[in-house]
A protein has these predicted regions:
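A structural signal for multi-pass alpha-helical bundles of membrane permease subunits
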Residues: 10-246
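Short, Lys/Arg-rich, polar N-terminal cytosolic tail immediately upstream
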Residues: 1-13
Length: 246
């Protein structure tokens, strides 16, 4: 009986420690995600005016939204941006992570990682302003560069298709470094014995990547894909600054 009591007490202590570590993340999730979502849904059921007078209208706001053709057009453009941005970011992130992993000089590897991660530390609005100077019709750096070689300048933000590509480039520039760090950490966690066994079996670098590295990156890949899709739906500030919402 004493042994059983000790075991149950030990188990309770382990559970307490576990929940103590989880509690801060749960509080953050509750305060910054769950409660705002619930409150936003509550607000969507009312008609609000500037006098802060509300009138309950049920799901009328959702009916209005789904019957608006502009909303469907905006949603379609968002999906196009997602299909353009997410695969490109995913491929580039893995590619650069693998290449950096081959760099033996720690200082050089650290410099490269810092250079890639730096854009992630600035806000989307600042990043948008920086890239707007590059995309400007006449004095933008890209057009100046093109004209220096006798090429015709482009109105990069002047059409929907070109603007979408430009926005995707900015999103990739911002988030590439963060995803590289994630993939690089996952690659370094792969036991080196796997690669030694593959080398003994005569596998080349391409076969090693497809048979060992890429499959073992699945958890990180899923996380990166999910966060990338979310990011493509949360870039309104970037779009408003660069295109004015058009």
């Amino acid at each position: 009986m004493k042994q059983k009591g000790k075991m149950s007490g030990k188990k309770l202590k382990q559970m307490f420690v576990t929940y103590t570590f989880v509690l801060p993340d749960f509080i953050g999730l509750l305060v910054f995600i769950i409660i705002p979502i619930i409150y936003s849904f509550y607000m969507s059921l009312y008609d609000w005016n500037f006098a802060n007078i509300k009138q309950f209208i049920g799901i009328q706001n959702y009916v209005t939204m789904f019957s608006d053709s502009e909303w469907w057009q905006s949603l379609g453009r968002t999906f196009k941006l997602t299909l353009l941005y997410v695969p490109a970011l995913f491929i580039l992130s893995i590619l650069f992570a693998v290449l950096i992993n081959y760099v033996k000089n720690e200082k050089a590897a650290g410099f490269v990682k810092t250079a890639f991660l730096l854009p992630y530390s600035i806000t989307s609005v600042i990043a948008s302003c920086l890239w707007m100077f590059l995309y400007m019709d006449r004095s933008g750096f890209i057009n100046v560069f093109l004209k220096a070689f006798g090429l015709k300048g482009e109105k990069f933000l002047g059409s929907t298709s070109q603007a979408m590509v430009c926005i995707a480039v900015v999103l990739i520039w911002i988030n590439l470094g963060y995803n590289i760090i994630l993939f690089l950490s996952a690659i370094k966690d792969i036991p080196y014995s796997y690669y030694e066994a593959a080398k003994l079996d005569g596998a080349n670098s391409w076969q090693t990547f497809w048979k060992i590295t890429f499959p073992l990156l699945k958890p990180t890949s899923v996380f990166v894909l999910i966060t990338s899709v979310i990011a493509s739906f949360q870039c309104l500030d970037l779009i408003m600054v660069m295109t004015g919402g058009g």
